[in-house]
Each structure stands twice: as structure tokens, then as C-alpha cells.
Regions:
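Accessory nucleic acid-recognition modules appended to NTPase machines
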Residues: 3-176
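Well-ordered alpha-helical segments embedded in enzymatic catalytic cores
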Residues: 45, 205-212
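Conserved catalytic cores of phosphodiester-cleaving nucleases, focusing on short active-site segments
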Residues: 152, 179-202, 210-211, 224
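Conserved hydrophobic residues forming the short capping helix/wall of the S-adenosyl-L-methionine
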Residues: 156, 214, 240
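Residues at alpha-helix caps and immediate loop-helix transition turns in enzyme cores, especially N-
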Residues: 177, 202-206, 236
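Arginine/glycine-rich "motif VI" loop of SF2 helicases in the C-terminal RecA-like domain
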Residues: 212-221
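Domain-level recognition of nuclease-like catalytic cores that cleave nucleotide substrates
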Residues: 225-257
Length: 257
């Protein structure tokens, strides 16, 4: 934050720090790694694959062309360094579903900088910065989910025994469903939550979808919590007004907490 405070806006800060060859944070990744790992290129390929959406050891191995044992060893080392962590789905039962980049700097670097280094090295960082801005809400939405969970659980009387992200099969369409927050208390009641970080208002379709997905896991619903960066449509507000299970949260509440 101290680095950002000296700039007039976020765009100029990102451009100067990341999107120029001499940017303070442009080469920081290699500075941090060079004293810690061998075969740096393999580590970078693994993190790039993860930033691109691969989150299972086998998928990462296939994407980067390394064997699973090598990738598994790299992931374990990155985990010990605090850069990645295992991801678990907590409902309907606890299970490991993959890995994700937990460190914010590395997540940003390998999502927006690493794949476009050639452009940045040719002083075309503005092109990359524009691409970054187009996708920044999606990135921030994922990074802010822990704050959403903390806010919801810190502002209810619900006392969960376990909580977190959930991925589970839909027995009707045979596809996987995802919910940002599922919390379960000792009495077997469920609390569900979704966080939408985008420039458009959240509509009733998001509320309906959350209620539908929740019904696949439990009929004992304590509450349905939806957070939106940009507020809610009149239809969504009206829907929540007539269903006391819904609790709507404006995104600025997360930034204040």
C-alpha cells in the first residue's frame, strides 16, 4: 500500500510497477525465486498453468509437459514457500479438489505479467495493462472471497463447524456446481453465499441460482448471502424483500471491514 500511495491513481501505479521492463515489481518474481529454487523455468511453467486455470496435479503436468511426480514436488515446495495452497471442497463431504496460487503478488504476476513479458520487454506494456483492466474484476473477485466469508460469518449468529468453498455434482444435469461459501453448523443447518465482483448490478437470476444450488445440498437453510460490487437490480431487491432467507451485501462493506 505504501508503494501505491505515491501514485495519483491505480493505473499509473500498475503501469510503473509492473508493465515496464524497469518496474520495481516486474522482476521481483525472479529475485524472490533465484535464491530459493533450481530449475526456475519449471516453477514458472507450473505457476503459469495454474494462473491459466489448471488446478489439479495431472492437469498441470499435461499442460506444462512435465511428469506428475515432478509437478507434485514443485507444488509441495511452493506450498512450503507460502505461494500455493491446497483447495478443499467442504460439502457434501470434505475432499481435496486441487491447488491454487494463494500469494496475491504471484497470482497477479502469473495471470497478467508472465504470459506477456515479450510485449512488456518491447515497451508495449500499455497493451498488456489494457488487457489487465478488462479482466481485473474477475481476478479481484476471486481474491476477495476470503474477505466475503469473514464478513458474512462475522456478522451473523451462525456458528459453523466447517465452512468454505464447495464444488459438487448436480445429479440432474450431471455437471459440477460451485458455491463460494457453504457453512454447516452442529445442528446440520446450512448457510450459503456468493460474491459477485463485476461492474453490473446483480439480478434476481443470481439469487435464484444460489437458492437452486443450495437446495441440492440441504433443505435446512439458515440463510442465503449475496455480495455485489455494484449493487442489485430492483428485481433482486424485491425478491430479497419477500424472502427473509436472502441477505444482500454491498461490496463496499467488505472494503470497510
Amino acid at each position: 500500500m505504501k508503494l501505491l500511495s505515491s501514485y495519483k491513481n491505480l493505473e499509473s501505479a500498475l503501469n510503473d510497477l509492473f508493465f515496464t521492463p524497469t518496474g520495481f515489481l516486474y522482476n521481483e518474481e525472479r529475485v524472490l525465486f533465484n535464491s530459493s529454487v533450481r530449475a526456475l523455468n519449471n516453477y514458472e511453467m507450473v505457476l503459469s498453468a495454474m494462473a491459466g486455470g489448471a488446478n489439479k496435479t495431472g492437469d498441470i503436468a499435461n499442460k506444462v509437459g512435465l511428469d506428475k511426480a515432478n509437478v507434485s514436488s514443485i507444488l509441495q515446495n511452493l506450498c512450503m514457500m507460502g505461494i500455493v495452497e491446497e483447495v478443499y471442497s467442504i460439502a457434501p463431504k470434505l475432499k481435496k479438489i486441487g491447488w491454487h496460487i494463494s500469494d496475491g503478488y504471484f497470482a497477479f504476476y502469473f495471470r497478467f505479467i508472465y504470459p506477456y513479458r515479450n510485449l512488456i520487454e518491447r515497451n508495449q506494456g500499455t497493451i498488456v495493462l489494457n488487457h489487465t483492466y478488462e479482466n481485473l474484476n474477475t481476478f479481484i473477485g476471486r481474491r476477495i472471497e476470503p474477505d466475503f466469508i469473514d464478513y458474512v460469518l462475522g456478522n451473523t449468529l451462525f456458528a459453523p463447524e466447517r465452512y468454505g468453498f464447495s464444488e459438487f455434482p448436480n445429479p440432474i444435469n450431471k455437471q459440477n456446481e460451485e458455491i463460494d461459501l457453504v457453512a454447516i453448523d452442529r445442528e446440520g443447518r446450512y448457510l450459503f453465499g456468493e460474491c459477485k465482483w463485476r461492474n453490473q448490478k446483480v439480478g434476481e437470476d443470481v439469487l435464484t441460482s444460489l437458492a437452486r444450488k443450495a437446495s441440492l445440498l440441504s433443505s435446512s437453510v439458515y440463510g442465503l448471502y449475496v455480495c455485489s460490487k455494484s449493487g442489485f437490480t430492483d428485481e433482486a431487491l424485491e425478491m430479497a424483500k419477500h424472502n427473509n432467507k436472502f441477505h444482500l451485501i454491498n461490496g463496499d462493506k467488505l472494503l470497510e471491514s
